[in-house]
Amino acid sequence: MKPLSEAHKEFIEHLKSKKRTTSTILAYGKDIEQLINDLTERKKANVAEVTAEDIRNFLLKLEKNGYTHKSLSRKLNATKTFFRFLKIQEYITDDPASLVEHPKFDTKPPRILSPTEYRALRDAARDDVRIAAIIEVLLQTGIR
């Protein structure tokens, strides 16, 4: 059986070998570290001991601590990638993360500028023709 901490180190090395960005490696590393800390509190030391219920409980704990559904979804992405890696490496036979669904979250429509904000933005760029042209394109096309 593979200890969680050892699997975590191998996963980070795997991400580096796949040329993932530094920010991805850091984010996934911290997310998996957070998961492992939670699993350790639950007396889970090896990758084969982790269940889908453990992962769900981890996400519920984070939600109770104020994490948004979007943040939980990102952490679940890291977890799913980690467990896919473990399965490919044959450290586990079943992937418990594949049984966990992403939390639903609402996407808010973009905020529309008020007429005053619209005028202020145009006035701020009045002295620079290039910036004024860029702002006009943004304002007239609705590009975000």
Which sequence ranges carry the predicted segments?
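Conserved catalytic core of the tyrosine transesterase superfamily
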Residues: 1-144
